[in-house]
Curated annotation (Swiss-Prot):
Gene: argS
CDD domains in the cross-refs: Anticodon_Ia_Arg (cd07956)
Keyword line: Aminoacyl-tRNA synthetase, ATP-binding, Cytoplasm, Ligase, Nucleotide-binding, Protein biosynthesis
Name of protein: Arginine--tRNA ligase
Protein EC: 6.1.1.19
BP GO terms, sorted: arginyl-tRNA aminoacylation
Listed transmembrane segments: none
NCBIfam families the record matches: argS (TIGR00456)
InterPro entries xrefs: aa-tRNA-synth_I_CS (IPR001412), Arg-tRNA-ligase (IPR001278), Arg-tRNA-synth_N (IPR005148), Arg-tRNA-synth_N_sf (IPR036695), ArgRS_core (IPR035684), DALR_anticod-bd (IPR008909), Rossmann-like_a/b/a_fold (IPR014729), tRNAsynth_Ia_anticodon-bd (IPR009080)
This protein's record includes keyword Cell membrane: no
EC category: ligase
Length: 558
């Protein structure tokens, strides 16, 4: 209902002022909405903004459309407080199974995320990409968009040539129980060590790259088999984090289907294209970049950038909105891609850049073989969660404690990563992420479990009758925050800022816990008891829906 009442307020102000921008802001602790439009009117009317605000309040309050909205002036500010009907309608709506789901849209969205090179396991540095991307996918789906999640699979670059050389020459046996990505990274790390000790083997990597580009069948099979083994392991890791991609798209596709050459032919017509022998590059210095954006090497082989351009043209043909999630170290590459697509008259992707997540312990690098994998992070978090669950619920069987610990661990990792704005770096802290008493995923999951427990107890006591009458400040604060969920979801997809939802659901858990503490539910009587149980049910469902968008399991018992 919050979105609808925002629009109603905007319409009232536009009609009263004749202005398009009526300067609506959040009302903070004093109101549901506020407007500073009196400042804009003061410039033309040559009046004190506070006087204008008072006059507008009189005009607005007299309108039939303002029924149920308390409108007042505080100095130059106009405050809007939504009344009992709004609260009742909001709580009623929040009890629907599909609460928060927005009307179906027709614009298709493709979100590419994770896309780590298949030369080893995902590490902690990769999974911020994964969590941000998957949360956006879930948010767009909840917001009514047809969405496809894609993973761009590098199956021909230099790093993959090193993997292929390792598989071809080292002949390691697969250890029982070893994941595919773990198996492949052993070849990759050892091949790099050998190359460092014996630089004379470097031309063998170059030869493999030339063969894959030429489509040599034996080399193609070697590369694809190696990549597929690693990708299977990566998919297992993603699945353990509640992440599924709709499509894995091979980079070689755009080399062999002619689309890369097609885009290079179009670029050839630009006046800023240059050649040195077989090398081809764009001079993007007038666009604010370095003067060489290389698209073909001196030996005639293509580079990643050329294939990436073809990939984005292919995506554009299938969607109305293309979104890439990339690390901050890809800002230059991303900007060059966007600029080049604009130069040939094509739509550039929207890019969500993120700073990196790290651990207090050490660095992460695949090439050197020193890294903390996503699997290790989740396993360690699960181990620590199991210890906490065992202390809190020793009466539960081990299987039940394992189930809770896994959900808590995945939730802790996902939430601790997504709660921070993408443009800010963050350090994953186990103690903070697993704190049941503070603003973490377990804290929010526990709020949901508490709401479920209250509803179960009410059912055992004979149930309750729906009631939507609220006056207590803790009731009203909780109900009005519940009403904002669809609005926050819309804001996430418009601004591509998933941390907004993480903040919203944390605040919802806070408000619910305050309500639980200061507004007794099961011990209340009559309509008060019924109304509070109705509100608990609405909060339970809102927590469930919001946690679902965050990819976190809403536990019914903890």
């Amino acid at each position: 209902m919050y979105r609808e009442y925002i629009q109603k307020t905007i319409d009232l102000l536009r009609e009263a002022t004749g202005l398009e921008d009526v300067m609506i802001t959040d009302g903070g602790d004093h109101a549901d909405l506020a407007s500073t439009v009196s400042f804009a009117l003061a410039k033309t009317q040559r009046k004190n903004p506070a006087v204008i605000a008072g006059e507008l309040v009189a005009v607005l309050s007299a309108k039939p459309e303002a029924k149920g909205i308390e409108i007042s002036a505080k100095g130059p500010y106009i405050n809007f407080i939504f009344g009992g009907d709004y609260v009742a309608e909001s709580v009623h709506a929040a009890r629907r199974e599909d609460y928060g789901t927005l009307p179906a849209r027709t614009d298709k969205v493709i979100i590419e995320h994770t896309s780590a090179n298949p030369n080893g396991p995902l590490h902690v540095g990769h999974i911020r990409n994964t969590v941000i991307g998957d949360t956006l996918v879930r948010a767009f789906r909840k917001a009514g968009y047809p969405v496809e999640a894609q993973y761009y699979l590098n199956d021909m670059g230099r790093q993959i040539a090193i993997v292929a050389w390792g598989v071809q020459n080292l002949h390691y046996d697969r250890i029982p129980g070893e994941k595919g990505d773990e198996y492949i990274v052993r070849h990759y790390v050892e091949a790099n060590k050998i190359a460092k000790a014996k630089p004379e083997i470097e031309p063998e990597f170059d030869l493999l790259m030339e063969k894959i580009e030429a489509g040599d069948p034996e080399t193609v099979k070697l590369f694809h088999d190696s990549v597929d083994i690693c990708a299977d392991g990566i998919k297992e890791t993603l699945s353990s984090m509640n992440v599924v991609h709709d499509k894995f798209v091979r980079e070689t596709t755009f080399l062999w289907n002619g689309s890369m050459q097609d885009v290079l032919n179009r670029i050839e017509k630009l006046p800023i294209v240059h050649h040195e022998g077989q090398m081809m590059y764009l001079d993007l210095s007038d666009e604010g970049f370095g003067n060489r954006y290389v698209l073909r090497r001196s030996n005639g082989t293509s580079v990643y950038a050329a294939r990436d351009l073809a990939f984005h043209l292919w995506k554009n043909a299938q969607c109305d909105r293309s979104i890439d999630v990339l690390g901050a170290d890809h800002k230059l590459i991303g900007a060059q891609l966007q600029t080049t697509l604009k130069l040939i008259g094509e739509r550039p992707p929207e890019i969500v850049h993120f700073e990196f997540v790290s651990l207090p312990e050490g660095s992460m690098t695949t090439r050197g073989g020193v890294f903390i994998t996503a699997d290790e992070l989740i396993a360690e978090t699960k181990k620590r969660a199991m210890e906490e669950v065992t202390v809190r619920r020793p009466e539960l069987g081990e299987d039940e404690r394992e189930k809770i610990a896994k959900a808590v661990a995945v939730g802790a990792v996902r939430y601790d990563i997504v709660k921070v704005s993408a443009e800010k770096s963050t350090v994953f802290d186990w103690k903070e992420a697993l704190d049941f008493e503070r603003q973490s995923a377990p804290y929010i999951q526990y709020a949901h479990a508490r709401a479920c427990s209250i509803m179960e107890k009410a059912k055992a006591e004979g149930g309750f009758a729906e009631c939507y009458e609220y006056s207590d400040p803790y009731e009203l604060a909780l109900a009005k925050h519940i009403a904002r969920f669809p609005y926050v979801l819309e804001k996430v997809v418009c601004e591509l800022r998933p941390h907004l939802l993480a903040t919203y659901v944390r605040d919802l858990a806070d408000l619910f816990n305050s309500f639980y503490r200061f507004a007794p539910v099961l011990k209340a009587e009559g309509n008060v008891r019924d109304a509070r149980l109705t509100l608990v049910d609405a909060c339970r469902n809102t927590l469930y829906q919001a946690l679902g968008v965050l990819g976190i399991e809403a536990l019914e018992s903890m």
